[in-house]
Design a protein with these regions (language model features):
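C-terminal amphipathic alpha-helical interaction region
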Residues: 111, 116-180
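C-terminal substrate-binding/catalytic lobe of Rossmann-fold NAD(P)-dependent dehydrogenases
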Residues: 1-124, 131
Length: 180
């Protein structure tokens, strides 16, 4: 799943939308601090990189290509488009862990900056300013780190439409809910 990358692609497609309305930045009644904005953008960048690398890994596994994420990061770092120090941080983490869900330093960074992106999203949402990539990154991370996430809702929807059973949070028993 690459929600941040998909959101960036969709935003690019929609950038030529003929039905745009203008939102005046002067009408925003609350300032977004430079620090919060910087932290939110970097948060989203980290999420996007992890999602992209995870996509490469899944492709590699499905096609039996033994693609090394560490080598990908080295090649990107040596290129001319992506030369971010983030690549060095990710390379170090992957060299030590080789799993997307064991990148403790990266996930600790994201956890520490969750409040900054949340604040930016509160202000932009309140003022009808679309931030699809920031929103997708924030929701992706919340979904990864939350006990109660949308998969619970998906299970409920499956039970509603096809009686597939759910497990309530206060029970270990699988049940069908009477939705009527």
């Amino acid at each position: 799943s690459i929600p941040s990358i998909s959101a960036a692609y969709d935003a690019r497609l929609q950038s030529n939308n003929q039905y745009t309305t203008k939102t005046s930045m002067e009408s925003i009644d609350e300032d977004i601090s430079d620090k919060n904005l910087s932290d939110a953008l970097y948060f989203s960048r980290v999420c996007s990189m992890i999602q992209g690398l995870e996509l490469i890994t899944k492709f590699s596994e499905s096609e039996n290509h033994e693609i090394s994420i560490v080598e990908v990061l080295e090649n990107w770092r040596g290129g001319c488009i992506i030369r971010s120090n983030l690549l060095l941080d990710l390379k170090k983490e992957f060299s030590e862990n080789n799993s997307f869900y064991s990148l403790d330093n990266i996930f600790n960074y994201l956890q520490q900056n969750r409040a900054a992106i949340s604040k930016v999203l509160q202000i932009t949402t309140k003022n009808n300013i679309p931030t699809p990539v920031l929103s997708a990154s924030f929701n992706w991370f919340n979904n990864l780190t939350s006990v109660d996430n949308p998969s619970n809702l998906i299970q409920a929807q499956r039970d509603f439409f096809g009686r597939h059973k759910v497990q309530k949070v206060d029970s270990s028993e699988d049940i069908n809910i009477d939705w009527d």
